[in-house]
C-alpha cells in the first residue's frame, strides 16, 4: 500500500511542479547555464560550503560505513546540520570520473536543494512524529523526486529521449532501472500531466471547495 501511495504522490508532484524548470534554476543557482555539465564533486566540495553555513561534506572510510539505507552516500538534515556523507571508495571513484559515483553525489545534492533551496521538505520537520506508513511514503516520494531532479541535472531532456529511441547511451552505467523509467516517464509526459492538472484537477478541487463552503454556510 505504501508503495502505491508513493507512486500516486510522485505523479501528483509531477503534475504540479515543473521539474525541468527546477533543474535549470538549480543550475543557475550554482552559476551554470542549462547546457553545462553538472559538476557534482566541485559543488559538494566547495560551493555548498560557501552557500550554506550549516553544510558539511564528510568522506567516511569503508570500514566505518554504517548506514543501512544507503551503500554509497546519504544526506542528513537537522536544524543546525545539513550533511552529505559518502563512502571513501565511492569518493575515490568520483574523483576518477566514475559516472555512477558522480550521480550518487548529485543525488544527495538534489536532496539538499529540494529541502533547503526549493523548500520542498515534504514534512521533514515533523518526520519523527509520523506513523511508520507515512514515513515510508514520504521517504519514497522524496527519493523519487530527488532521482528525477538529479536525472534532469545530469542529463538534458533531449539526451534522455534521444538515448531511449536510439539506444546510443547506456544509462544503466550510472542509473538504476527505476530511476531511468521515472526520468523517461516525466520527459515523455510532463506536458500532458501539467495540462491535466490545470484543466481537470484544479476545476474539480475548486468545485469541491465551493460545495464544502456552501454546506458549511447552510449548516
Question: Positions of the model-derived regions?
Answer:
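Active-site hotspot residues in diverse enzymes, especially metal/ion-binding acidic/histidine motifs
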Residues: 1-219
